[in-house]
Amino acid sequence: MIVKNTEFIKSATRPAHYPEGHLPEIAFAGRSNVGKSSLVNVLVNRKNLVRTSSTPGRTQLINFFQVNDDFMLVDLPGYGYAKVPLAVKKEWRPMMETYLSKRRNLRGVVLILDIRRTPTEEDLQMLTWLRAFSVPPVIVITKCDKVSKNERARQSAIIMEKMHLKKEELNYFSALSREGKDAVWARIDALLEPTAAETPGIPEEPAPPGPVND
């Protein structure tokens, strides 16, 4: 996809505040400091469209951005930051469950994992939700420039085991080298293809009349 324009639309915490309209949505999820902001900024060719919070995990908002006139990019709040107050942590679960299970515009979720970190229970919970709600995941492994090839292979094996993933499901990404940018876009573009229900059908021509029996 060629990104010509990306603009912030609004923030929301509940369905009543979600943007109206029928644009498909691709959401981005991951724990705090996983590189979500860098991934989004590289994909849309912007430096500060999504900013890294100075207090990770404190902002529990779902942020909606419109990309061209094609789709909504949805930035989900980060999770897993140890210093987040308990009350904030309790808000995160119902907010995520509601969006993932009820949002009809949602086409898929880019689930972001750090190549240097072992997946957490929150990561597994997110993937479990996506599978339970039939939301297609795109698994993106970030910060790949920070490890050697051997370490990448070792960590990939751990991620696949912990998350019950296959090798072909992993998409490697580096904000520094831009490795994986095109591959991630290809996955997103595939999810944005119109579904059968959204594609106007071509009326069938009436069948030619059969032979008439006297």
UniProtKB/Swiss-Prot annotation:
Assigned keywords, A-Z: Cell cycle, Cell division, GTP-binding, Magnesium, Metal-binding, Nucleotide-binding, Septation
Ranges of compositional bias, category Pro residues: 203-214
Span of the signal peptide: none
GO MF annotation terms: GTP binding; metal ion binding
UniProt-annotated binding residues for GTP: 30-37, 57-61, 75-78, 142-145, 173-175
Residues annotated as binding Mg(2+): S37, T59
Every EngB-type G domain range: 22-194
Entry-linked Gene3D superfamilies: P-loop containing nucleotide triphosphate hydrolases (3.40.50.300)
Cofactor(s) recorded in Swiss-Prot or TrEMBL: Mg(2+)
UniProt-listed GO biological process terms: division septum assembly
Keyword Metal-binding applies: yes
Chain positions covered by the region annotation Disordered: 195-214
GO CC terms: cytosol
Coiled-coil ranges per UniProt: none
CDD domains, per database record: YihA_EngB
Its job: Necessary for normal cell division and for the maintenance of normal septation.
Family: Belongs to the TRAFAC class TrmE-Era-EngA-EngB-Septin-like GTPase superfamily. EngB GTPase family.
PANTHER family reported for this sequence: ENGB-TYPE G DOMAIN-CONTAINING PROTEIN (PTHR11649:SF13), MSS1/TRME-RELATED GTP-BINDING PROTEIN (PTHR11649)
The protein's name: Probable GTP-binding protein EngB
Source organism per UniProt: Geobacter sp. (strain M21)
Gene name tied to this protein: engB
